[in-house]
Amino acid sequence: MVETKLMEEQRWGPVWFIPGQNKGRYPYCHSLYIEGAGILIDPASDRERLIQLRKEHGVNAVWLSHWHEDHLMHLDLFDDLPLWISEKDTPAISSVETFLDCYGIEYHGYRKYWRQLLEEEFHFKPRKPTKFLQGGQTIDLSTVTVEVISTPGHTPGNLAFFFREPKVLFMGDYDLAKFGPWYGDRYSSIEETIDSINLLRKIPANVFLAGHETGIFRGNPGKRWDDYLNVIFDRENRLLQFLNQPRTMEEIVEACIVYGRPREPKAFFELGERGLMKKHLERLTKAEKVFQEGNKYIKNAAIQKGKLIPNPTTTDHK
């Protein structure tokens, strides 16, 4: 049964944390609202609450941390308002077909599933941004100063927001959840994901806000950063172990290295498994730790049996 009870709203000066339904788990996320300026960030928390928020306090513009559907589910409520997003993430919201292309969805049946899902559950409508948010920008909203931070990897134009006066950092989908980072889109990057996480952990914030699940971390999350990064290396190590013998892409996907077991709907979970494994194969092939022979992948024989990839997070950041 889906848990529908909401977490409590929290406020740090003009920065309001609006919890998502089901504790911000997909397909929901936590939203932010900036009082005074009327800025709403990532409108996919709770539809009724967002309607109430606009009616009682006013919403003047919507900002998106990135283009994913679970961060714009209720954007349709604000069709008449200015929309700000990074330029690199803009193409994905320009049409349903481009959205699917950015996910790397090729199979016709999966595209049909996602097309229906986007339109019916996520109320997707093509949008053209009013302005572009750029990493390095400092925006004075009168009630608070916002530093826009470029955090690519999850998506090419992924953004975080540091609210200077209350020292609050919104990390978006770098959520420190046990599942680990997502970097399975067509234009995602493992290397950029690692760099962005290591950038965020150094921000001098008193409060770290994430787009999903726990949502609020008072003080630096500490070991949670390493645990989060380690998921990347654990996935890679398991893949390397699986490639002790030649494997096709289909065999790799069926091994369920990411999700642990076959799950439904396949159009969602098989797509995710394939996307993440593809990124790891690209990374391992580039490092010559894996070779491709025809339609099969195999671990480089020069890698000693049982020797795993060193985990840089265990020594680089304490």
Spans of model-derived segments:
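Active-site neighborhood of phospho(di)ester-bond hydrolases with catalytic His/Asp-centered motifs
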Residues: 41-44, 59-70, 83-87, 150-153, ...
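C-terminal regulatory/interaction regions
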Residues: 238-318
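A short catalytic or substrate-binding loop motif that flags glycine-/basic-rich loops and adjacent residues
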Residues: 24-26, 133, 152-155, 318
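Short glycine/proline-enriched coil/turn segments at helix->beta-strand junctions
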Residues: 35-38, 55-59, 76-82, 164-166, ...
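Metallo-beta-lactamase
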Residues: 145-236
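Conserved beta-strand hairpin/beta-sheet module of binuclear metal-dependent hydrolase folds
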Residues: 2-53, 160-174
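Active-site HxH/HxHxD metal-binding segment of metal-dependent hydrolases
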Residues: 22, 27-28, 45-140
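Soluble or luminal CAZymes and related metallo-dependent hydrolases
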Residues: 45, 131, 188-192, 231, ...
